[in-house]
Amino acid sequence: MIVLGLEGTAHTISCGIIDESRILAMESSMYRPKTGGIRPLDAAVHHSEVIDTVISRALEKAKISIHDIDLIGFSMGPGLAPSLRVTATAARTISVLTGKPIIGVNHPLGHIEIGRRVTGAIDPVMLYVSGGNTQVIAHVNGRYRVLGETLDIGIGNMIDKFAREAGIPFPGGPEIEKLAMKGTKLLDLPYSVKGMDTAFSGILTAALQYLKTGQAIEDISYSIQETAFAMLVEVLERALYVSGKDEILMAGGVALNRRLRDMVTNMAREAGIRSYLTDREYCMDNGIMIAQAALLMYKSGVRMSVEETAVNPRFRIDEVDAPWITDASRKDYGKAGAESRIEEVSFHGRPAIRKVRISKSYRNSDLDKKIRYERMRNEFTILRKLKEAGVNSPVVYDFDPFSMSITMQKIPGRMMSAELNEGRTDFLNELGIMIAKMHRAGIAHGDLTVNNIIVNDSVFIIDPSMGKVNAEIEDMAVDIYALEDSIKGLGLDSGSVIGQMLKSYRNNFNLADDVLETVSAIRRRHRYV
């Protein structure tokens, strides 16, 4: 089967042609604004002007005619609406003229599937980093699930916006990478990891302020990369332990960055897992990836009429079935974690846990020390305040800043994730009460997921090391957002589970509606907004 794929979600229009065993041809054209960033209408004009030529050249390279094509795939979303419409119109035209079937493809799905094809990865956790996208994705129960993502802007957009303010034309990423290689001074930038999610707007604001005050652009670029990339690798490693996967795959334009690739490779080596880096020519948006995803969808039984191919600028990967993937058996990581090592000890005859903050070689050493110490101190402080607020949580027995460790009460029971996977839901009412108590006390957890909640006869909240006292509504909303997404990531009937928990939360916290409205606002900020 010969498949033609058309990609056109943002700045690049591309045509790729494949069959089951060969990549036959690829032709692309990128819109490059003379000044500023991407202007959606101008990008669409560029695509409409060159798309015929791009398709013709790809057919010439493949040494076939348009009538030899058996299937047409196109990027349905997410993306810039004007660009998406140009691409979809071309795909529909080819389908109607040739009488061949057409399939609309989710753009991130294409990145994953071409990465799996060219690297040999089987069931990886994918770090997908580009201009508008920053996501950590894994396959769970028949679909790819978003385990973590940006809460504001994509990392590529952040880098490009800084570059633009510094007088560097689009795309600014490659030049920032070169400048960073000459930097030596690590500047203080916000390190914003919230559970499995990240935020980059604070880094952009601080970096622009450094630029205004005359700091060397080499040092600013170096600091942007060291800080932002460390955030990405941290959440990627956390996703491994949550999902039980033992492979990593990188894709997207930012995945071309050598420093990021080195950091991911180092993390994978320390964790004892395999890392796969998508070939450089297929990291950027391209038609081959759309053709590959369309091929897999078609072979799994997906069919679409032309009327069903409307574009969707907010199309999420977790809306798409992916039955061609068989989830690999879960890797047992034991008591290892992304940030700490857990040891079972005895404290004056009491069963206890000693949590040691471990160094991460992929991070800048100064940044690593700062993060480890701040989180350890924060966990100690917030655990005490949770107890004062009546929230079930471990009692802290000892705090040793010299060994970067905390010793605390051992809580018997199982993680909430394990209980939900076995169908237990009788604890959800109490969970809502505990979260309400925490938020009433002005405390945000910062990493409230199904793996930081222990269930026995009661519900216990653990590991608030990323938390915040004197929390604002936005901080509390991130707690609910993170918990909802971690429940959805299990692939269960998440609506019922979340609904039970939120009903109890609402009944016990007078600001719950404000928090939940902010959760909705956070979700609306995703991708190209």
Swiss-Prot record:
Fe cation binds at residues 107, 111, 128, 285. It catalyses: L-seryl-[protein] + ATP = O-phospho-L-seryl-[protein] + ADP + H(+); L-threonyl-[protein] + ATP = O-phospho-L-threonyl-[protein] + ADP + H(+); L-threonylcarbamoyladenylate + adenosine(37) in tRNA = N(6)-L-threonylcarbamoyladenosine(37) in tRNA + AMP + H(+). This is Probable bifunctional tRNA threonylcarbamoyladenosine biosynthesis protein. ATP binds at residues 335-342, 355. GO terms for molecular function: ATP binding; iron ion binding; metalloendopeptidase activity; N(6)-L-threonylcarbamoyladenine synthase activity; protein serine kinase activity; protein serine/threonine kinase activity; protein serine/threonine/tyrosine kinase activity; zinc ion binding. Component of the KEOPS complex that consists of Kae1, Bud32, Cgi121 and Pcc1; the whole complex dimerizes. L-threonylcarbamoyladenylate binds at residues 128-132, 160, 173, 177, 257. Binds 1 Fe(2+) ion per subunit. It comes from the Archaea. Residues 329-529 form the Protein kinase domain. GO terms for biological process: tRNA threonylcarbamoyladenosine modification. The active site is at 447 (proton acceptor). NCBIfam families: arch_bud32, arch_KAE1, gcp_kae1, PRK09605.1. It is an enzyme of class 2 (transferase). Keywords: Acyltransferase, ATP-binding, Cytoplasm, Iron, Kinase, Metal-binding, Multifunctional enzyme, Nucleotide-binding, Serine/threonine-protein kinase, Transferase, tRNA processing. In the N-terminal section; belongs to the KAE1 / TsaD family. Signal peptide: none annotated. Its cofactor is Fe(2+). Its EC number is 2.3.1.234, 2.7.11.1. Required for the formation of a threonylcarbamoyl group on adenosine at position 37 (t(6)A37) in tRNAs that read codons beginning with adenine. Is a component of the KEOPS complex that is probably involved in the transfer of the threonylcarbamoyl moiety of threonylcarbamoyl-AMP (TC-AMP) to the N6 group of A37. The Kae1 domain likely plays a direct catalytic role in this reaction. The Bud32 domain probably displays kinase activity that regulates Kae1 function. Residues 1-324 are annotated as: Kae1. InterPro entries: ATPase_NBD, Bud32, Gcp-like_dom, KAE1/TsaD, Kae1_archaea_euk, Kinase-like_dom_sf, RIO_dom, tRNA_threonyl_synthase/kinase. GO terms for cellular component: cytoplasm; EKC/KEOPS complex.
